[in-house]
């Protein structure tokens, strides 16, 4: 992610150092399973301990090897073997293929990211709840359908709907965390040619994961749970931001984002107070939707494996998490200092008071015994004449 929209907690998960540490975590879980289960591998527990005591990551050396091999996982495995001063290092990556390490690590990093996203969602929900508790939440504000005056409601009703949308998204994030419970250590083509089912299951258990039926890679539709959960949050945040933008339009002006002292809205028009924060949220939401489309396209791979998805995934997995956390944080800052112009909202509601009571007028006639069509027609005519 470019520095402007980077979120540090997400960066810490997806940065190269942590990615390689996660790869190492997967490799060590596999070695542990090889050494402690009855297999034809002669890796002893003592040799395993030698590996664990000496194995280390040297990023510079990894990059040096990769420049020659042009294969990041092969370079990683070679670097690890070089760090172990013993022949036992030959068992590193035994029976595995690169996708075993990459895809299982992806699952772990996605789960970590969702935990951070959960926290940011909770923070935003906190500020939304504070709005409901405010004295101004009971004030009247006009509801609008199709952009036209509908009925009078309260600010609390607006805020409650915002909360409901974000809570649905929050639930989707939690559900995605529970669904991301499978990994893959079944080797080339997913056939368990060298690494048996028992070894795979035991290694994955160490990582709090389960084995899955798949080819050489974890099917990309499996990761759609991650992207879909983020999409739900993005859509909920975008809706709130978009509503605030509408409420801040001149002539409406019932709510607006904070405008700080010394802030400028335009280089040419000094009077301008543009809703740049909520507009920024909507812009980043558009970007995320393009990532969601890419994630869907990545689900199609050639037979047992290809890497057509790889280049895009190096961007969309981490940047998706950056985007959603950034816009959640930005929305929290907007909500914390949201301008609620209750007097203007009251005036706007009063202007349309006759029209917004049309349902009550129609219902009164229905209660008097008139047909619904007659009641609707008469009420509509009276409203148009403003004759009540």
Region locations from a protein language model:
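Glycine-rich cofactor/substrate-binding loops
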Residues: 1-26, 64-70, 269-388
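Charged, flexible cofactor/metal-binding loops and thiol motifs
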Residues: 103-118, 122, 133, 147-301, ...
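A general structural motif at alpha-helix termini
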Residues: 48-52, 248, 259-262, 349, ...
């Amino acid at each position: 992610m470019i520095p402007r929209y980077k979120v540090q907690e997400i960066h810490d998960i997806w940065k190269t150092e942590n990615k390689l540490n996660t790869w190492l975590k997967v490799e060590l879980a596999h070695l542990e399973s090889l050494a402690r289960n009855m297999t034809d591998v002669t890796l002893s527990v003592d040799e395993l301990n030698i590996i664990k005591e000496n194995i280390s990551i040297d990023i510079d050396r990894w990059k040096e090897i990769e420049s020659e091999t042009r294969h990041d996982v092969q370079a990683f495995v070679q670097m690890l073997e070089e760090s172990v001063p013993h022949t036992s290092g030959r068992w590193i990556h035994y029976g595995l293929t690169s996708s075993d390490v990459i895809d299982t690590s992806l699952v772990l990093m996605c789960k970590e990211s969702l935990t951070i996203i959960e926290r940011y969602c909770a923070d935003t929900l906190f500020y939304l709840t504070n709005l409901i508790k405010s004295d101004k939440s009971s004030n009247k504000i006009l509801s609008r359908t199709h952009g036209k005056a509908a009925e009078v409601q309260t600010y609390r009703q607006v805020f409650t709907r915002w909360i409901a949308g974000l809570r649905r998204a929050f639930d989707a994030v939690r559900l995605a965390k529970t669904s991301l419970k499978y990994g893959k250590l079944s080797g080339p083509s997913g056939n368990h040619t060298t690494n048996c089912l028992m070894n795979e299951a035991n290694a994955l258990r160490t990582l709090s994961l389960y084995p899955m039926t798949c080819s050489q890679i974890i099917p990309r539709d499996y990761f759609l749970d991650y992207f879909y959960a983020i999409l739900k949050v993005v859509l909920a945040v975008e809706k709130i931001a978009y509503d605030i933008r509408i409420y801040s339009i001149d002539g409406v002006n019932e709510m607006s984002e904070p405008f700080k002292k010394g802030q400028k809205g335009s280089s040419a028009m000094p009077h301008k107070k543009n809703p740049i924060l909520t507009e920024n949220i909507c812009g980043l939401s558009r970007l995320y939707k393009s990532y969601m489309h890419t994630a869907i396209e990545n689900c199609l791979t050639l037979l047992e494996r290809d890497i057509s998805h790889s280049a895009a995934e190096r961007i969309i997995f981490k940047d998706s998490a950056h985007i959603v956390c950034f816009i959640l944080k930005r929305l929290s800052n907007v909500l914390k200092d949201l301008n609620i112009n209750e007097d203007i909202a009251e005036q706007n509601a009063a202007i349309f008071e006759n029209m917004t009571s049309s349902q009550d007028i129609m219902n009164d006639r229905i209660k008097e015994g008139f047909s619904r069509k007659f009641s609707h027609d008469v009420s509509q005519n009276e409203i148009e004449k403003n004759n009540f």
